[in-house]
Amino acid sequence: MELAEIRNELEKTAQQIKDFRGSLDLDSMEVRIAELEDQMLDPNFWNDQQAAQKVINESNGYKETYQAFHALEEEQESMEISLELLKEEADEDLQEELEKDIKAYMATISAFELKLMLSDPYDKNNAILELHPGAGGTESQDWGSMLLRMYQRWSEKKGFKVEMLDYQAGDEAGIKSVTLLIKGHNAYGYLKAEKGVHRLVRISPFDSSGRRHTSFVSVDVMPELDGDIEIEVRTEDLKIDTYRATGAGGQHINTTDSAVRMTHIPSGIVVTCQSERSQLKNREQAMKMLKTKLYQKEQEEKERELAEIRGEQKEIGWGSQIRSYVFHPYSMVKDHRTNYETGNIQAVMDGDLDDFINAYLRSRIG
């Protein structure tokens, strides 16, 4: 890279930093961080643990953005100083180091820009992720367990906490359905990119003839909503069943009927929860999930109406196939919405999803 090219790249990144500063109200951010820190110093702060966690998450989100922006500014300044030194006197080692730094810096800017894109009202929330294998018995249920592992690995890499709200084991292998609560800042903002049908093509390990099989799993993703959302659920509209909680392999993990299945009769929505040992807590969590689903249904209906008014042929919901994972006759994972693809299928199954998620989020604002 010639010095003129380095200068051009640094001029571009300097403009990006300027644009970031224009879109971030840093003064207001400082004030809000101070307010939240004052709340955390209150002796009664932990009396309401749910409210306390909400304050901590908000504070961490602002701090992360604030610190990341200032780190970008400092790095920009440092590289501009290196460029000035190179103009005064050629230094091969310094130039090589600067070229590497610029490449890494551009990737960091890209990641920062992506975080700023997560500005929808619930992007910052925790995510509820459900996996539902399609028809195909053991084959599709095994595919469900592979996706479960993939999302668990991705969450670990992000530093997110995963709670298993519900687990229904498959008949021979895999899962019949799973509900996860993924806790972390912007968890929903990222994972909304995964909503849809995921298709697998492989030689089935369950087929003695070694034939190729195609399996489908639908992934549904919702933000975990707090108590601020007003959704009325009438007691007479509910059917509540209780049963023994089961774990992987089908064994009972509790001796009482602590697991809860809640059916909302007017909408047909069913939610289940067995993560807690107490039936009462499982009821509370199931009600929270039900309200989230009812709210989501309401929002999707509004979106559908708006699309019809505008004359848009826009599919809403999770019924569309979004991504294919092909293990045979070649290795390829391809997202059908963005056309982003990779041949490194094992890395994807080990949780390397960020490139797919990033491509989707960028396509939404493109």
UniProtKB/Swiss-Prot annotation:
Tell where it localizes. Answer: Cytoplasm
Name the Gene Ontology biological process terms. viral translational frameshifting
Top-rank lineage group of the source organism: Bacteria
Q: Does the keyword Secreted apply?
A: no
SMART domains in the cross-refs: PCRF (SM00937)
- Residues modified to N5-methylglutamine: Q251
> SUPFAM superfamilies from the xrefs?
Release factor
Is the keyword Zinc-finger in the record? no
Keywords carried by this UniProt record: Cytoplasm, Methylation, Protein biosynthesis
Q: Give GO terms: molecular function aspect only.
A: translation release factor activity, codon specific
Q: What does this protein do?
A: Peptide chain release factor 2 directs the termination of translation in response to the peptide chain termination codons UGA and UAA.
The record's family statement is: Belongs to the prokaryotic/mitochondrial release factor family.
Q: Which NCBIfam families match?
A: prfB
The protein's name is Peptide chain release factor 2
The gene name reads: prfB
